[in-house]
A protein has these predicted regions:
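Hydrophobic, aromatic-enriched alpha-helical segments typical of multi-pass transmembrane helices
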Residues: 1-154
Length: 154
């Protein structure tokens, strides 16, 4: 990290990744909004739960994204200003830890819930072949269980 060019390139990569994650958060909500009129005919409660869960997932993703962009700002604005290196390291590691936890909660837990809800709605409605809906019914709980395992250090 001693060479400024390397740091600038890494910051640009993080910014590009942030742009992609922003697009992900927007499309998560867009997917739920597009599916809302279709799946609400089966169960308005489950359809609303799906939309709410997608919104929560997107919010969690954005929180993690903000923490990662804060690390870039911390590096660019304060590291060169002669701030205490130990304090900056602790703050940076804390912000990265926030990103890691939000990655577990958003794409971990919420995706499992979303898969289960959507799989059940599609299974009941017959909008997709049953075998395809079963992927959501089986995959959702597996993703959720995987996130729980990671949460407890497995």
């Amino acid at each position: 990290m001693a060479e400024p060019g390397i740091c600038d390139a890494r910051a640009q990569c993080i910014r590009l990744g942030a742009l992609c994650e922003s697009f992900l958060a927007i499309t998560n909500i867009g997917t739920a909004v597009v599916l809302w009129p279709i799946v609400k005919r089966q169960s308005e409660t489950l359809a609303l739960s799906y939309v709410a869960s997608r919104v929560v997932e997107s919010i969690i993703i954005v929180v993690g994204l903000i923490s990662l962009l804060s690390v870039v700002t911390l590096r660019e604005d304060f590291a060169g200003a002669g701030a205490d290196a130990g304090s900056l390291t602790i703050a940076g590691k804390s912000l990265v830890a926030i990103h890691d936890w939000t990655f577990l909660l958003g794409p971990g837990f919420c995706v499992g819930v979303n898969g289960l809800l959507l799989g059940y709605l599609f299974y009941r409605s017959g909008l997709v072949p049953r075998w395809m809906a079963i992927f959501g019914l089986v995959g959702g709980p597996l993703i959720f269980a995987s996130a729980i395992a990671v949460l407890f250090g497995a």
